[in-house]
Amino acid sequence: MGWALALTATAVAVTGPAAAEGPVLHDVTYTVYADNPFPADIYYRDTDPPNFADYSHNPYMFSPKIEADIGPGQPWILTVRLANPEYWAMVTATSGLSPTPPTFHCTLAVDGAVVVSNSGAKGALCSLRNW
């Protein structure tokens, strides 16, 4: 019985504690559409900045922009994984300088639950954080 205990202790000592896991990542789904077909400018956050100073120094590094043709039956949908969606989840859609913008709509869902929705003429912003 003594050798079994010694063997178990050796196995524990050799393997050591389990490796530390990274932060829990949340599925964040952005959805944007408009009342009429329109080429929208969409900015979104797809990664957690390491800290606010890095984000503040160059926010566009962490907020890609795409142009997407959206409409009532043609939403733009993207799911990203963020560790801190309460700080960093954000999507905004704008009409740029168009003289005839549609009404934009956005939703932001975290782990399948819609937590923010918004709409507006010329653009819409969905974020958990007040900017």
Q: Residue spans of the language-model regions?
A:
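Extracytosolic low-complexity repeat regions of secreted or lipid-anchored proteins
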Residues: 75-128
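Mature extracytoplasmic domains of secretory-pathway proteins
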Residues: 45-98
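Secretory targeting and sorting signals
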Residues: 1-20
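Short loop/turn segments at connectors of secondary-structure elements within structured domains
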Residues: 14, 24, 38, 100-102
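A broad, low-specificity signal marking well-ordered, structured residues that form hydrophobic/aromatic
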Residues: 18, 28, 124
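Short, surface-exposed binding/anchoring microloops in extracellular/periplasmic proteins
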Residues: 21-56
